[in-house]
Amino acid sequence: MAEKFDHLEEHLEKFVENIRQLGIIVSDFQPSSQAGLSQKLNFIVTGLQDIDKCRQQLHDITVPLEVFEYIDQGRNPQLYTKECLERALAKNEQVKGKIDTMKKFKSLLIQELSKVFPEDMAKYRSIRGEDHPPS
């Protein structure tokens, strides 16, 4: 899969370089540089065609819209991944806390129900396959 991206990256680097060179030609345009300008424009068109061909190999790749927003804001798109992982970790810790709280609640509930309804709770534990009441 990496070779698909390598191929695209190579074409994008060539395209960006041609755009940079075109900018230089245009910024100091002289009638004598018309041939160079036309050549660069042809290279850019060819580069866009090459990039379009890469699109077919990458049709199954999806990029979250937020990544493009990061790029538009001048931020590093890898920060998006970092922030997603941090949010997932925080959510995971929050859910773990809820699970631990529910386990403690269940244990306390069973203890209290065992005090009030010892026979019923003994039946419950036998159905559940528990030999002794939880402490």
UniProtKB/Swiss-Prot annotation:
Q: Which InterPro entries match?
A: Mediator_Med10 (IPR019145)
Q: What is its main location?
A: nucleus
List, alphabetically, the GO terms of the cellular component aspect: core mediator complex; mediator complex; nucleoplasm; nucleus; ubiquitin ligase complex
Q: Where in the cell is it found?
A: Nucleus
What stretches pass through the bilayer?
Answer: none
Could you provide one GO biological process annotation from this protein's UniProt record? positive regulation of transcription by RNA polymerase II
* Signal peptide positions on this chain: none
Q: Which GO terms describe its molecular function?
A: transcription coregulator activity; ubiquitin protein ligase activity
Keyword field: Activator, Nucleus, Transcription, Transcription regulation
Q: Name one Pfam family in it.
A: Med10
Of which family is this protein a member? Belongs to the Mediator complex subunit 10 family.
Q: What does this protein do?
A: Component of the Mediator complex, a coactivator involved in the regulated transcription of nearly all RNA polymerase II-dependent genes. Mediator functions as a bridge to convey information from gene-specific regulatory proteins to the basal RNA polymerase II transcription machinery. Mediator is recruited to promoters by direct interactions with regulatory proteins and serves as a scaffold for the assembly of a functional preinitiation complex with RNA polymerase II and the general transcription factors.
Q: What is this protein identified as? A: Mediator of RNA polymerase II transcription subunit 10
Q: Which organism is it from?
A: Mus musculus
